[in-house]
Swiss-Prot record:
Residues 493-587 are annotated as: Type DYW motif. PPR repeats lie at residues 145-179, 200-203, 217-251, 252-286, 287-315, 319-349, 351-381, 383-417. This is Pentatricopeptide repeat-containing protein OGR1, mitochondrial. Residues 462-492 are annotated as: Type E(+) motif. GO terms for biological process: mitochondrial mRNA modification; mRNA processing. It comes from Oryza sativa subsp. japonica. The lineage of its organism: Eukaryota, Viridiplantae, Streptophyta, Embryophyta, Tracheophyta. Disruption phenotype: Opaque seed endosperm, late germination of seeds and plant retarded growth. Residues 386-461 are annotated as: Type E motif.
Amino acid sequence: MSVSAAARHLESLLPRLASLRHYLQFHARLLTSGHLGAHPGLRARFLDRLALSPHPAALPHALLLLRSLPTPATNDLNAALRGLAASPHPARSLLLLAGRLLPALLPRPDALSLSFALKASARCSDAHTTVQLHALVLRLGVAADVRLLTTLLDSYAKCGDLASARKVFDEMTVRDVATWNSLLAGLAQGTEPNLALALFHRLANSFQELPSREEPNEVTIVAALSACAQIGLLKDGMYVHEFAKRFGLDRNVRVCNSLIDMYSKCGSLSRALDVFHSIKPEDQTLVSYNAAIQAHSMHGHGGDALRLFDEMPTRIEPDGVTYLAVLCGCNHSGLVDDGLRVFNSMRVAPNMKHYGTIVDLLGRAGRLTEAYDTVISMPFPADIVLWQTLLGAAKMHGVVELAELAANKLAELGSNVDGDYVLLSNVYASKARWMDVGRVRDTMRSNDVRKVPGFSYTEIDGVMHKFINGDKEHPRWQEIYRALEDIVSRISELGYEPETSNVLHDIGEEEKQYALCYHSEKLAIAFGLIATPPGETLRVIKNLRICGDCHVVAKLISKAYGRVIVIRDRARFHRFEDGQCSCRDYW
């Protein structure tokens, strides 16, 4: 057999290598036949397969082979780098690579080498290494490579350095769709969903910036929908949906799943379910069902969440996310027995979130002893969130002893957030124990803990309007305050009396009524009434849970003004219509 024929024969064997023994035998054959040095292309392809093999000993053997080569080629380095980037320990692998290969620059890395290294640094969120690799990109003169710069941008974004990611993007003279997608996803998944949407609109209006024949793809749409879902911008979400239709992406299952999530989080349950039912049954995935069940749950339709869970086809096995979504639905609807039944029948090991939902379910129902017993009998120690859940239940039912126990546990765990103090203070205030309230506030001051201010915002004609309690910063604040006076007058005719028990301060009754009147969600609703046509649905998002008085007021406004009002608070959705709320006053 000729040398070239032998090489071709060995090449044909590469796809058949299935075990570490096969790889070692192939390596030995390369050594004994002389092909290891004579055919660098074959060697690099072998290294690539070896480095990516799932066997735990394969990658170390690939690195050993690389270091044994007297004159390794760049392709050899890239094969090892690719394996390192995909390995379970990219940080350790990068350290090994930086210490033994890159400083000597033998072999000389190319754009592909740096791309694999950047993927590894992104996986381990190593911003420092990304900066060093960025310097190497400039030093080696490969800063014109669009794919490499896209990977650099992506690495910065995944390391949380969105400013550097944007700088790389802005300095690029040529951008392909992957470049736009990387920054879109980075902004949407990071802390800048508003910037992500602005970037999406820029892309939507600037197709000429993409190379010829390139179009937005499912990654583009999913990132934009994620941003809409986070902020609760229904109109923007609908625009993204229409945009997806232009490119035939609205039938893509991944896009559909994101649409379900977006519509449900923007308060349009009906649209979310329309998208779910538009997916062919055979194409519906676990993610599709999880998104639809979560949609029912967050809107307080626990019974519907249970029914959809029971209707899941046998080919789809529920996972932890599925069970959590169903349990949340039971929790928001007060379906205690159903929730316990689902929890006790779980086919996956429950985690802290599952236990936390059960504790909340029992706590809301007033079964505080069972809730406490669940906390102390779990197979792992309760975390801060679980004790906060129990503290919230104690506050809801005014049980001082349990509240103090939970607060002490939180202190032992090192929790020092405003919510812990506020809940305990509220329990004391509900019992008119003002000295204890003062003591809690003194502790907050001494620990430099500040209460997170409540705020609400609403979207009118594509513009977000934000309000805080007692806000007078809005340009139309005087109109808003006059509208509130009219609201109070009209709903008083329907029997409204301010629930001053929600004002947890030792002040007079008149002062309490004034404090209640100008809560941020009331300001947002009042603005919506004067800024939108009669009959239009009002949508409000609040960063904290809605208070009892605002809940009553929203119900009465929906009746007095003939409006549907949808409020998304920290925990769930409330849909107010004709004097009723979708939560059935269980929240």
